[in-house]
């Protein structure tokens, strides 16, 4: 299979969540992908645990989007500062560079972080990362 070459930061979309554009850091040091989420609340639907959450897809913007997804799992994740946190895990489609594939994403508060989303190693099987490049698939620092 041909792999798509990406830079260390790219614009992507999460179509099942209604997120048309989100700037993400392609982080080979992170095992699991992470998405900024706030106002997180669990609820039951058809006998399954679901989660409702809001996100700010764009840094330094009050624009928010409310999303819902079934909870796939709950995992304890250790962040880069060594802090351990139990996070809900969802599975959703990632669209990047003309490809779409399902990825597992943990939800956490990334409000103080530079990127609203991290793409971890387990979601990179279709990618090759060029660590010195950015936005190889289009866009720039400020827009997709």
Predicted regions and their residues:
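Pepsin/retropepsin-fold aspartyl endopeptidases
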Residues: 1-144
């Amino acid at each position: 299979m041909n792999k798509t070459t990406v830079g260390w930061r790219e614009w992507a979309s999460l179509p099942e969540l209604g997120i048309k554009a989100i700037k993400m850091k392609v982080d080979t040091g992170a095992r699991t992908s992470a998405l900024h989420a706030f106002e997180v609340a669990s609820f039951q639907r058809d006998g399954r645990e679901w989660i409702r959450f809001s996100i700010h897809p764009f840094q330094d913007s009050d624009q928010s989007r409310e999303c819902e997804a079934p909870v796939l799992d709950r995992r304890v994740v250790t962040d880069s500062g060594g802090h351990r946190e139990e996070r809900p895990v969802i599975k959703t489609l990632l669209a990047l560079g003309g490809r779409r594939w399902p990825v597992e994403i943990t939800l956490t508060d990334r409000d103080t972080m530079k990127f609203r989303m991290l793409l971890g190693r387990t979601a990179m099987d279709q990618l090759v990362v060029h660590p010195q490049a950015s936005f190889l698939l289009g866009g720039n620092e400020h827009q997709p």
